[in-house]
Amino acid sequence: MSFRSIVRDVRDSFGSLSRRSFEVRISGLPGLSGHHRGKSLGSLSELRDRPVVVDQSRWVGLPPELLRDVMKRLEEGESNWPSRKDVVACAAVCRTWREICKDIVQSPEICGKLTFPVSLKQPGPRDGLIQCFIKRDKSKLTYYLYLCLSPAVLSENGKFLLAAKRNRRATSTEYIISVDSKNISRSSNGYVGKMRSNFLGTKFVVYDTQPPYNAGSLMSCQHGSRRISSRRVSPKLPTGSYPIAHVKYELNVLGTRGPRRMQCTMHSIPASAVDPEGVVPGQPEQLLPGPFEESFRSTNTSSRFSFMDRSLDFSSSRFSEISGSANQQGEDDIPEAKERPLVLRNKVPRWHEQLQCWCLNFRGRVTVASVKNFQLIAAASSESSQLEQQQQQQQQNHASSSSSASDHGKVILQFGKVGKDMFTMDYRYPLSAFQAFAICLTSFDTKLACE
């Protein structure tokens, strides 16, 4: 049997296995099987105690040494979508296969690939950009983020990643972000965060359902926030709403004729993350929180989630435990909580005399002039400048100082128009796809005070 035949057989058998598992679980629920006989629903303890007999795939008992070799070949061979779905299918066969995939499939920061759902909230690659594009639907006030599969952005469908829906309110505008393209709402199981603006459209706050490394300090600084115990909230709904970023647009005296000036304060990313040896702490292990993931997890590969199944988030810890431990530790107990957040600013464009417009070098990724186009780089702080002066005075290694300066000058996020309701979005470390998408959504909002 060929290698690809093995992969197809594993994927097909896994799909039929998950369907049988789902039918067994549904038939065991009183009131849903049609034989409740007037009785009320049983307790969750009774439901968990009931054994579920499911047929196992014949590939579950594959020797670990052979399985690891198969996974390595699959990881190297199926490096791009849509063929990369075979890696996702193999990771969902059983716990043994999943653990091996966790060891072989690296994070986007290292490999530069988006494989599992949790990759959407992990930092991008340090070397190079992950190229994406955004489709806007003005009639439905929705925005869809896709992963570029080829250089032809206008003619490809891409790999769906995230969706956002704009909700207008009396004093603000809210963008709901979800991994479910068909049900974009806070009540959806695919809800991963939101972005809210003020009335003038000059200030924005990005909220995440996942707790960052400094969740305790963020929630304590949030004005009027109320902490709700995760045990008192429905476990199927996300309980966290952490303000991880603030985006501010400054007044533009030239109006629509001049470039926008924006500043992004990333509270979930320390300023030291852009240093050569810097890291982004507190990276999530799962995309969607779910305390009942072991009892109600559906392993169907044809899930209604448009990106990938939530059962492949690779986490054994519950969201309530993570958030609880973050809230129990005070700001004094966490040294990282006092570290300065990363600040991003837009790269200043230059005026082109012949074209009579402001220009930025997007390296062919942006083709239509628009006030929405921007490039973000790390802002130079006073402390980092003093540190560089001290390094020069002490005559330290010139290579390390030049490397640090180059890292601060790299474009971390760029966004621009390429056609009608079509925009490109390219991001890199230390931003994640979710953070980059939320920042780009601020450019779509109407800015009464800036234009």
UniProtKB/Swiss-Prot annotation:
CDD domains (alphabetical): F-box_AtTLP-like (cd22153)
Ranges where the F-box domain occurs: 57-112
Pfam families on file: F-box-like, Tub
Tissue expression as described in the entry: Ubiquitous.
Chain intervals for the UniProt region annotation (Disordered): 387-407
Taxonomic superkingdom: Eukaryota
Biased composition (Low complexity): 387-406
Entries under SUPFAM superfamilies matching the protein: F-box domain, Tubby C-terminal domain-like
Protein family: Belongs to the TUB family.
UniProt protein name: Tubby-like F-box protein 12
UniProt organism field: Oryza sativa subsp. japonica (Rice)
